[in-house]
Amino acid sequence: MANYDVLKVDGSKSGSVELSDSVFAIEPNNSVLFEAINLQRASLRQGTHAVKNRSAVRGGGRKPWRQKGTGRARQGTIRAPQWRGGGIVFGPTPRSYAYKMPKKMRRLALRSALSFKVKENNFTIVDNFGFEAPKTKEFKNVLTTLEQPKKVLVVTDSEDVNVELSARNIPGVQVSTAQGLNVLDITSADSVIITESAAKKVEEVLG
């Protein structure tokens, strides 16, 4: 267990929180992390690519010329692959690129990603944001006060509409819940801001 500073949105220290080293301070497993990122990227692919083979191309129902006597090579249809406008051979067909990964590996990847951010000092814990209404300007000021880079992942305990709407129009800022936290979002961000309650929830799930 290790103690981490908890900040207020004005940058002052609010207190500290004790979090498990098995979640936030492990030696990152790069190979598992790489596999988890590839898995997520693969599942994001649409896989709607398609071409028409010789049976799907329109036309070509009759034989273009008789079998014998013309001196030309025999042909059965003008939609054979060697013809212009003919069907495609072994072309792409619609498919899903998604594949599965064992739960233990997925959780190890998450712990590795979080530990990497902590190790690089790109991990900030705040007590809470406490927005009573969506305020983009105020949220931008919070990021400036906390000295955050352009690409930031904000993690809240549960869905916070005011935080989501405040951050929605700021380029490079993404909001997630503790339950929806994933490896691709963490590694894509330069820094992670997480509320104290969200950090506890993540520790509970991954610990």
Curated annotation (Swiss-Prot):
GO molecular function terms listed in the Swiss-Prot or TrEMBL record: rRNA binding; structural constituent of ribosome
GO biological process, one term: translation
Database matches in Gene3D superfamilies: 3.40.1370.10
Domain of life: Bacteria
Annotated S-S bridges: none
Bias (Basic residues) ranges: 60-71
Positions of region (Disordered): 54-76
Keyword Transcription regulation: no
Gene Ontology CC, one term: ribonucleoprotein complex
Annotated function: One of the primary rRNA binding proteins, this protein initially binds near the 5'-end of the 23S rRNA. It is important during the early stages of 50S assembly. It makes multiple contacts with different domains of the 23S rRNA in the assembled 50S subunit and ribosome. Forms part of the polypeptide exit tunnel.
Protein name: Large ribosomal subunit protein uL4
Gene name, Swiss-Prot/TrEMBL: rplD
